[in-house]
Amino acid sequence: MEEERDHNASESSLPSLSKQLESSTLGGSAVDVPVVDLSVSDEDFLVREVVKASEEWGVFQVVNHGIPTELMRQLQMVGTQFFELPDAEKETVAKEEDFEGYKKNYLGGINNWDEHLFHRLSPPSIINYKYWPKNPPQYREVTEEYTKHMKRLTEKILGWLSEGLGLQRETFTQSIGGDTAEYVLRVNFYPPTQDTELVIGAAAHSDMGAIALLIPNEVPGLQAFKDEQWLDLDYIDSAVVVIIGDQLMRMTNGRLKNVLHRAKSDKDKLRISWPVFVAPRADMSVGPLPEFTGDENPPKFETLIYNDYIDQKIRGWALEDLPVY
């Protein structure tokens, strides 16, 4: 228990706001995070590359991933069209008590300066279409097609991670619930701001779930905290950004890295991103798998019901760092 409390403190103890703003390569040269080309026929090579990137960085990009370029274009089109609607129309899918729905965060302070749309994608039993925009009319069709591709890609990556760490291919997929694992989309809309050195589009955080797959538009802004500094990530056109979350880190007893990351707004250009978060069911127990623990490597984390983990992590965040969802 003591180890768990200590590590949870480190998970939720984010760099101070001054550190977040000062220690950054923003405006300088972006760094190249690992890139994995899925068109490579040598699957053993892909397994090694995915594991290495997840252990050393906790974030990487995949190219030639099989998601049609036209579908990605349509996804960006319908998302942009939604945020261009009048506020009154966007408010028809506004948040109520749950995290789902539309929200605008321009409330002063520097964190979470954005608008966003949040809703569940899968499994079908948890989808609430009242939070899916009816305008633009193609939104649902495009998003459902995109979900199919993202699920296939997620399961491929989880399978490679499992195999690369000496597990059965389905281990990580089944450990987060298999077909009942929850997929959630958040469309982030970061408008231009002249106060780029004073405003953070999305505050520094690690993802609470297992893994996230993200597509941004062409405007840079995603940053990762590595080697005691914030690094701007150089995005490759049509790539998918893969981000390792807390639960894969916990299941592997710390072997995989849950990367701390944030989003910055641009001075002149609109930035939009489409992360899909993949997480266990709320009632699932998640903790170190036996393959990663032993007499010389005791569990670093307590096995917790996922919903309890969420509550514990949120309580550990400072109010100013709390994501607004």
Curated annotation (Swiss-Prot):
Cofactor(s) annotated in UniProt: Fe(2+)
Region (Disordered): 1-21
Tissue expression remark: Expressed in young seedlings.
Gene ablation phenotype (knockout): No visible phenotype under normal growth conditions.
EC code(s) of this entry: 1.14.20.6
Domain of life: Eukaryota
Residues where Fe cation binds: H205, D207, H261
GO molecular function: flavonol synthase activity; metal ion binding
Polar residues: compositionally biased ranges: 10-21
Reactions accelerated catalytically: a (2R,3R)-dihydroflavonol + 2-oxoglutarate + O2 = a flavonol + succinate + CO2 + H2O
SUPFAM superfamilies: Clavaminate synthase-like (SSF51197)
Residues annotated as domain Fe2OG dioxygenase: 180-280
Family classification: Belongs to the iron/ascorbate-dependent oxidoreductase family.
Protein name: Probable flavonol synthase 5
Organism: Arabidopsis thaliana (Mouse-ear cress)
